[in-house]
Amino acid sequence: MISVNDFKTGLTIEVDNGIWRVLDFQHVKPGKGAAFVRSKLRNLRTGAIQEKTFRGGEKVAKAQIDNRKMAYLYADGTNHVFMDNESYEQIELPEDQIAHELKFLKENMEINIIMYQGETIGIDLPNTVELVVTATDPGIKGDTSSGGSKPATLETGLVVQVPFFVNEGDKLVINTTEAAYVSRA
């Protein structure tokens, strides 16, 4: 059991018969009344995001999850195949289970597979990934590094807002939690 006062981003907990990852949390101490913790949680089985409020000091069960390092191989219809680089064991995950993460996956990319009691429940992406711009409007002379942005389509199909100086073929660092441009690679 862990106190909600000890929440950290990325912590995995068991609440309401589900396995949840803490995406965001905020300790609130109102002027009148007891303190509480407002949190934003993602269900690791369904991908649903829910906001939940806990009383200060409330205890929740910490989920015992295992992470296995695997490489993303390919898409096979609606399933996606991953391989353990040590044992060469392959597993398939359905597209709807990892829909958000697919926007950042490239072939042969190393990621962590999240396992709970022997069941594969999702994947854990790195904080940032490097992706190549496949389509964007050309930069115009006079564009500066400050002010304004334009949409750019990346090699995985993800569309992000980028500064005007970014061109097709540029390799960018993308934040996976916010699906946002960070810098050029």
UniProtKB/Swiss-Prot annotation:
Main location: cytoplasm
Pathway: Protein biosynthesis; polypeptide chain elongation
PROSITE patterns in the record: EFP
Coiled-coil regions listed: none
Domain of life (superkingdom): Bacteria
Keyword Chloroplast part of the UniProt annotation: no
Cellular localisation: Cytoplasm
Family recorded in the similarity comment: Belongs to the elongation factor P family.
Function: Involved in peptide bond synthesis. Stimulates efficient translation and peptide-bond synthesis on native or reconstituted 70S ribosomes in vitro. Probably functions indirectly by altering the affinity of the ribosome for aminoacyl-tRNA, thus increasing their reactivity as acceptors for peptidyl transferase.
Name of the protein this chain belongs to: Elongation factor P
Organism this protein belongs to: Listeria monocytogenes serovar 1/2a (strain ATCC BAA-679 / EGD-e)
Organism classification: Bacteria, Bacillati, Bacillota, Bacilli, Bacillales
Originating gene: efp
